[in-house]
């Protein structure tokens, strides 16, 4: 089950893959074991609904997340089967970046109040996420420190009580370097997802700052304190990507102790680049490489779409 959720994490982020020329968006992916995930988007190109269907041995599970957006927050509602039992995740935005989140889980045991998770995020001057503070109402406080190299997140170190518990080492497929392929896999989902509550709307929209330049090729786990780290070397995993003649990724192979293949279904979009923000300039639409629409070009690589449909890259130094 852990492996399946890791595969879900991988493929869910493919929905943010932007191809400004083909104008395609991921609508669905399915695994060879019969599991699937379906994506729906609002008129602005933001992820509005995500449905995950898990074909378990005994029963079929149906997980649903919905996302609503305002200028200062994102509200995610999640339920499994019964909408009466809904978990709520609220992201607080500052200048278009998530600064904190509060997750309230509906499940309560033994008459106790529903448990919660509080997240606080720290970024560097390049808008790269460098630290995550996770404070649950039960269990231990955890700090994740993130190390970047050449525009990619390469190391995540997990700390409890100032002692390192383990490391997540990330290697990337640098043969895939397409500015429109904004975010194929986001390792943040491994540490930000609690249960089945995955902050995909926040991630799809680039609300966690800088996105990654390349898709992940492999993940390796190093245990520093036994029985205190969620993963081990047995969870190491490698990914390979298959493209069609148009350059779209149509299949992903995830190899752990077993091999799982995931098929992707894409569809044309009618409103140009999938956007996550409204722009005030109707003449020229400006986007970051993550597909985030903005008022004006910013430092770094920008994607400019002109009224005639022409798309060009502009670098601001």
Which residue stretches match the model-derived regions?
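Buried hydrophobic residues that stabilize the cores of well-folded domains
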Residues: 21-271
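Residue-level detector of functionally pivotal "anchor" positions at catalytic/ligand-binding pockets or at interdomain
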Residues: 22, 266-292
């Amino acid at each position: 089950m852990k492996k399946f959720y890791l595969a879900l994490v991988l493929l869910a982020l493919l929905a943010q893959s932007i191809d400004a020329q083909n104008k395609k968006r991921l609508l669905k992916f399915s695994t060879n074991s019969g599991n699937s995930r379906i994506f729906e988007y609002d008129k602005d190109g933001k992820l509005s609904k995500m449905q995950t269907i898990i074909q378990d041995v005994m029963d079929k599970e149906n997980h649903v997340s919905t996302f609503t957006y305002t200028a200062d927050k994102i509200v995610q509602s999640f339920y499994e089967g019964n909408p009466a039992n809904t978990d709520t995740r609220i992201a607080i935005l500052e200048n278009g970046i998530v600064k904190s989140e509060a997750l309230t889980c509906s499940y309560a045991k033994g008459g106790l109040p529903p448990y919660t998770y509080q997240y606080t995020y720290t970024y560097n001057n390049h808008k790269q996420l460098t630290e995550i503070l996770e404070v649950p109402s039960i269990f231990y406080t955890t700090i994740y420190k993130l190390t970047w190299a050449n525009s990619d997140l390469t190391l995540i170190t997990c700390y409890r009580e100032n002692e390192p518990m383990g490391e997540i080492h990330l290697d990337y497929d640098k043969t895939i370097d397409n500015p429109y392929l904004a975010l194929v896999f986001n390792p943040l989902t491994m540490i930000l997802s609690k249960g089945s509550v995955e902050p995909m709307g926040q991630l799809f929209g680039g609300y966690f700052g800088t996105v990654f330049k390349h898709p992940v090729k492999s993940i390796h786990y190093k245990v520093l304190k036994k029985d205190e780290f969620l993963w081990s070397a047995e969870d190491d995993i490698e990914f390979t990507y298959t493209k069609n003649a148009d350059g779209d990724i149509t299949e992903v192979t995830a190899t752990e102790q077993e091999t799982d293949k995931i098929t992707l279904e894409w569809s044309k979009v009618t409103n140009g680049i999938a956007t996550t923000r409204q722009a005030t300039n109707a003449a020229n639409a400006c986007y970051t490489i993550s597909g985030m629409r903005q008022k004006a070009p910013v430092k770094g690589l920008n994607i400019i779409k002109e009224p005639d449909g022409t798309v060009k890259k502009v670098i601001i130094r």
